[in-house]
Each structure stands twice: as structure tokens, then as C-alpha cells.
Amino acid sequence: MLFRSRSPIPIVADESCRVAADVPRLAGCVDGVNIKLEKCGSLREALRIVHVARAHHMKVMIGCMLSSTLALAAAMQLAPLADWIDLDGAALLDNDPFQGPCLQPDGRLQLNDEPGLGVTVKPT
């Protein structure tokens, strides 16, 4: 907590927060949590983490690891609930088999009007 109180930059728990039950023990120690679907396992658990974090007056970041467009499209569904978003994992893939919502050159995440997550398999 000493480091947090002296830092002008928000301190965000990443690997320490895998499920909603982790959030209460982090409250007061960090400013927020970084939610990654790869860590928590589902949109449902991610939403639980958001709700518990907000109940503890914490910030929420939606992040990713090295992820395909399919995984990022799912994570984008949580974007309206987040303070910060870092969903650029597909930009690092040479052979992402999916196409759909993507990171624009100006840094915006662009959703499309397709049904569901708006993701399709790239033609071969």
C-alpha cells in the first residue's frame, strides 16, 4: 500500500486477479484489476470480476495475452464497462485464422455490424 500511495500512476493487479474471489484481497492494495478472458475463463466470470471490483471502488482494465481476433471480439463485449482497454493481441499474430473487429491504425477498436461476435474464418 505504501508504493500505491506514493505512485502517480495507477497500480493494477494482473496475474493476481484470476477470479472474482481474488478482488476483495486486492482492494486497498491496488487501484484496479486487469481482466483477461484467458485468465478468468469466461465472459460470465469476467463480468463477476467487474461487479466485485466496482463494489470495492476499483478501476477495471480489459486486457489480453497473445489472442486471436475471435478471443478479442469476445473481450470487446466488456469494453463499455472498462476504464482502460488493451486488446491488441491479434496485431501480433502472423496467421490469425479469423477476421472481424480489429484494431484501427489510430488505436481505436472497431466493431462491425455482423451477427454474434462479428467474427468469421478467413478464406483460405
Model-derived regions, located:
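Catalytic alpha/beta core domains of metabolic enzymes, predominantly
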Residues: 6-12, 16-88
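Flexible C-terminal active-site loop/helix
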Residues: 65-124
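Short, small-residue-biased leader/transition segments that mark boundaries at the very start
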Residues: 1-2
